[in-house]
Structure formats: structure tokens, C-alpha cells
């Protein structure tokens, strides 16, 4: 839904008049509910690009004397969205706070990828109910991917009526209007665009620190894997223009950032929606590598769209890091077909072979789902054998979690939970075994570490990450924070490395 369509739509009441209860009569304010059916549609409307975002004069000062708090769940994209919302809050005059007790506005920026993530949010709403009761003027909002689901909005309406506002992933730029409406309205304000919005540039951001920065390069996903809710909650693929991305990265470099991560639900599809030119992720990376910033990463990749040109560009090295997160999900071609991943085991292994041939020292990590409907013991063994063959540095592993509205949710979940847990344990044992083996290879070596701060467990120890995203803990001066230093590894653990600074030099680049 672009701005014009939004204006034409007006206020929309729930379409389902046969629902258990018709809440539309209670709403005098904005009420645009989500629709997964509408979210499935991929229209041919051209994406509009807006470079003229600004806070309307009527909303300036809205936050004067008020504080905001945002709790973020889920992926890096949500963290990026939180940075944008924080920027809008600050532009409105709000002050950030780290305590819900001090906040005048609390937002939960939610994740819908798995049931466990949603349960955490509903649990948090339960905790915040008492806070809202003691402070009726508190504005409590739910945003992010969960808000795009009809079942979630209906549950909030029925079980958490003290929530003041709900909005989704496509209309973050309308936060000033929604806040104003929430202050004025006696009823819950709901505005969720089921269809994706335009690409809005020049949104304010409050970044977390000055060392590493997120740079969004595209929005949405068109892959429709049968288990995944993201194409519905994030909309169709829309790429930012390359000149906007390059300008943002240059600005971060000039501000002293040492590392940027390019973000997208499927970064490898970048540029496929451009109608006026042929330009992909490889072309963008080839431009960005010329910028004077030490490290550039990207996430998340889809094997189907990982092309040869990108591999050629990454092989040039320099500030383009050879750590690649390449989700496989399963090692069984039959399972991959049921998941609608659009590649098979052989195609994935062929891609891995190309990457390793071009970048022999590349570090590969992955995502794997166990217990997908109809997964047999033999098919699970194929996943284990693929993991051994590739020798991933690490993996995010999950038990299959049905998501309402996805094709897989209609499949019979016929793998017993006991079997799912056994498979997850066996997979995790293998992940730990290979990770420990690969980490052991670092002992005695000197690596470059981007120092992010003090260790969470010991303030006398500094912590940072290597180019291959290995966590390193070491003793060093506090002025090393924010710099890239050389560290000699003395001891390898399963998930981290311990070392000492090599020599007196602090910054190596």
C-alpha cells in the first residue's frame, strides 16, 4: 500500500462480519486491521521512492517532557527499525530511557518468526498491565511483524485491551500521526497496512553506538518458503536505490564507523525489482568496497539467488568479509522441495563449492530446521551428512514451529515432539563438535579484532569480533574500544576465543 492508496482507503472496518465479536463499532479512531490474504498478493504496482520525509510542524514538541522506551525482539531488521523509530521519537522531542518505569511511551517491536517469540511478547504485555493500571496516561504500543498477523491483533483486542496502539512494519514513518491519535483517542488505535508501502528515505535514526552500523538495502521477501511468515509480514521485495545506500555508507565511514552490515530479508535478491537498470548485490558490493571503511558484511542470503558475479566480487577481498551466512534449512532434497526452497541438496553443495574455490578461507554459517512435517529419519540423516560435508563454522538450529497463514501450517505436524527434540540434540552435538574443531585451529594465531566493549561477564576483559565473526575475549586498555587490534589467541573454546593483545600497536587500520 503506497501513500496514495492509503489515503484512498480511508478508515477500514473489519471485513469479517461473522467473527465472534464485531469490534468496529468501538472505534472512532483509526482502525485498519491486517489481512494475511491481502498480504499474499503481489501486485505490479511500481514502488514509489520518497526523499522528502519530515516531521510536520503540528507534531513537533509532541514529546516535550516525555520519555520513550522500545523493547526489540527478533532479527537485525527489527533492530534497524527500532533505530528509525528512536530517531523519530527524538525528532518529536522525546527523551530515551532504559527503564519502563520512567517511560511515557512503551513500544514492543515484535518478531513473528516462531511461536516462542510471540509468547515472549504476550508474556511481556501481561507484565506491563500493572504498569498501565498505575499510570493510565502511559501509551503502550505493539509494532513489528506480529502486528501484521490477524490472529495477533484479535488476541490483543480480546485479552489485552489496555494496549493503546498497534501498527505494522510498513508504516513506521507514520509514527508521529499514530502517537498523536493515541493521545487524543479513548480507544485503541490500529493501523496495519497489509500491502507493503513505498520506500521512504531520509528517515531519522538513532544508532546504537559508533562502531558497527546497520544499513538496510531492501525490504520484503518474495520466496514464500512454506514454513515462513516473513513474506506476509514484510511484503514484497523492494530495493533501495544504490545511490542512497552508497551515500549512507559513505556518511557512516566519515563518522568513524568500522563495520557496516547490509540488511535485507533476502539480500541476494537486491535489485531484481529495478525496472530501469540491471544492477544486483554484486554490483553494489563492488561499489561499496571502494569506500574507506574497514569491514562490510551482509545478511541474510538465500542460496537460490546467490550468483557467480557476487562470488567474484567477494573474492576481491579487502573490506568485503568472507564470512557468509547461507541458510540451508535441510540437507534433504525432498524436504527442501516441501519447504519450497527452490534448490536441492546438489545445487546447495555446488554453490558451497564455488564459494570455497573462490575464497578458500571463507567461513560459512547456516540455519537448519528439524522436525518439519513428514521428515523421516533418513532425511534427517541427510541433514547431518550435509553438515559434515560442508563443515559450517556454526549454525542456528530450530525445531519446526508452525506459523498460522503459511502453507506448512496446513500440513499434518506428524513428527512427535520427542523425536524432534532428539534430532535437535543430535544436530547440536554435531554443531558443537565441528565448531570446537574449527576454533581449535585459531590457537597460536594472531587475528584482527574489532573491539566492541567490555565483556559481559568481566569488566576487566575486552570483547570483540574477528572478520569471520568469532568472539574474542582479551585483556587490553579501554581506549582499544572502537578500534581494530591484533590479538594472539591462547585458548579456544566452543563458541569463543581467549587471547592477549599482540604488541603495543592499538589500531591496525
Swiss-Prot record:
Domain TRAM intervals: 440-503
Keyword DNA repair among UniProt keywords: no
Domain Radical SAM core: 207-437
Record InterPro entries: Elp3/MiaA/NifB-like_rSAM (IPR006638), Methylthiotransferase (IPR005839), Methylthiotransferase_CS (IPR020612), Methylthiotransferase_N (IPR013848), Methylthiotransferase_N_sf (IPR038135), MiaB_methiolase (IPR006463), rSAM (IPR007197), rSAM_horseshoe (IPR023404)
EC id: 2.8.4.3
Gene3D superfamilies documented for this protein: Methylthiotransferase, N-terminal domain (3.40.50.12160), tm_1862 like domain (3.80.30.20)
GO molecular function: 4 iron, 4 sulfur cluster binding; metal ion binding; N6-isopentenyladenosine methylthiotransferase activity
Matching NCBIfam families: miaB-methiolase, MiaB/RimO family radical SAM methylthiotransferase
Function: Catalyzes the methylthiolation of N6-(dimethylallyl)adenosine (i(6)A), leading to the formation of 2-methylthio-N6-(dimethylallyl)adenosine (ms(2)i(6)A) at position 37 in tRNAs that read codons beginning with uridine.
Record protein name field: tRNA-2-methylthio-N(6)-dimethylallyladenosine synthase
Classification lineage: Bacteria, Bacillati, Bacillota, Bacilli, Bacillales
Amino acid at each position: 500500500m503506497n501513500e496514495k492508496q492509503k489515503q484512498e482507503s480511508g478508515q477500514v472496518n473489519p471485513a469479517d462480519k461473522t467473527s465472534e465479536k464485531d469490534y468496529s463499532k468501538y472505534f472512532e479512531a483509526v482502525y485498519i486491521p491486517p489481512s494475511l490474504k491481502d498480504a499474499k498478493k503481489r501486485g505490479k504496482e511500481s514502488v514509489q521512492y520518497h526523499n522528502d520525509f519530515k516531521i510536520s510542524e503540528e507534531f513537533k514538541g509532541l514529546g516535550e517532557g516525555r520519555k520513550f522506551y522500545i523493547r526489540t525482539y527478533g532479527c537485525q531488521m527489527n533492530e534497524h527499525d527500532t533505530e528509525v523509530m528512536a530517531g523519530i521519537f527524538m525528532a518529536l522531542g522525546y527523551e530515551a530511557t532504559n527503564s519502563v518505569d520512567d517511560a511515557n511511551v512503551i513500544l514492543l517491536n515484535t518478531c513473528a518468526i516462531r511461536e516462542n517469540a510471540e509468547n515472549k511478547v504476550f508474556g511481556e504485555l501481561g507484565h506491563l498491565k500493572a504498569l498501565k493500571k498505575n499510570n493510565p496516561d502511559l501509551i503502550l504500543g505493539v509494532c513489528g511483524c506480529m502486528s501484521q498477523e490477524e490472529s495477533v491483533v484479535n488476541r490483543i483486542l480480546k485479552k489485552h485491551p489496555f494496549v493503546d496502539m498497534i501498527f505494522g512494519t510498513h508504516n513506521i514513518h507514520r509514527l508521529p500521526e499514530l502517537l498523536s491519535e493515541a493521545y487524543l483517542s479513548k480507544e485503541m488505535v490500529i493501523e496495519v497496512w497489509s500491502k507493503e508501502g513505498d520506500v521512504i528515505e531520509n528517515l531519522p535514526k538513532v544508532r546504537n553506538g559508533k562502531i558497527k552500523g546497520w544499513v538496510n538495502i531492501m525490504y520484503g521477501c518474495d520466496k514464500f518458503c512454506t514454513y515462513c511468515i516473513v513474506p506476509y509480514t514484510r511484503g514484497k521485495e523492494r530495493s533501495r536505490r544504490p545511490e542512497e545506500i552508497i551515500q549512507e555508507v559513505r556518511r557512516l565511514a566519515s563518522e568513524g564507523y568500522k563495520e557496516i552490515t547490509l540488511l535485507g530479508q533476502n539480500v541476494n535478491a537486491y535489485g531484481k525489482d529495478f525496472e530501469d537498470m540491471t544492477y544486483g548485490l554484486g554490483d553494489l558490493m563492488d561499489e561499496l568496497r571502494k569506500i574507506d571503511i574497514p569491514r562490510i558484511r551482509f545478511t541474510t542470503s538465500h542460496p537460490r539467488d546467490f550468483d557467480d558475479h557476487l562470488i567474484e566480487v567477494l573474492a576481491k577481498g579487502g573490506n568485503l568479509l568472507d564470512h557468509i551466512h547461507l541458510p540451508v534449512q535441510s540437507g534433504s532434497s525432498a524436504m527442501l522441495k516441501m519447504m519450497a526452497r527452490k534448490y536441492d541438496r546438489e545445487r546447495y553443495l555446488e554453490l558451497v563449492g564455488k564459494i570455497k574455490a573462490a575464497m578458500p578461507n571463507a567461513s560459512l554459517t547456516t540455519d537448519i530446521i528439524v522436525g518439519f512435517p513428514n521428515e523421516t529419519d533418513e532425511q534427517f540423516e541427510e541433514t547431518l551428512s550435509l553438515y559434515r560435508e560442508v563443515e559450517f563454522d556454526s549454525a542456528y538450529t530450530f525445531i519446526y514451529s508452525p506459523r498460522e497463514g503459511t502453507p506448512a501450517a496446513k500440513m499434518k505436524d506428524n513428527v512427535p515432539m520427542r523425536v524432534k527434540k532428539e534430532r535437535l540434540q543430535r544436530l547440536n552435538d554435531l554443531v558443537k563438535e565441528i565448531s570446537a574443531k574449527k576454533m581449535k585451529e585459531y590457537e597460536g594465531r594472531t587475528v584482527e579484532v574489532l573491539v566492541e566493549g567490555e565483556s559481559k561477564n568481566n569488566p576487566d576483559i575486552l570483547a570483540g569480533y574477528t572478520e569471520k565473526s568469532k568472539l574474542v575475549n582479551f585483556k587490553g586498555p579501554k581506549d582499544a574500544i572502537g578500534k581494530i587490534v591484533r590479538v594472539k589467541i591462547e585458548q579456544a573454546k566452543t563458541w569463543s576465543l581467549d587471547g592477549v593483545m599482540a604488541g603495543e600497536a592499538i589500531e591496525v587500520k
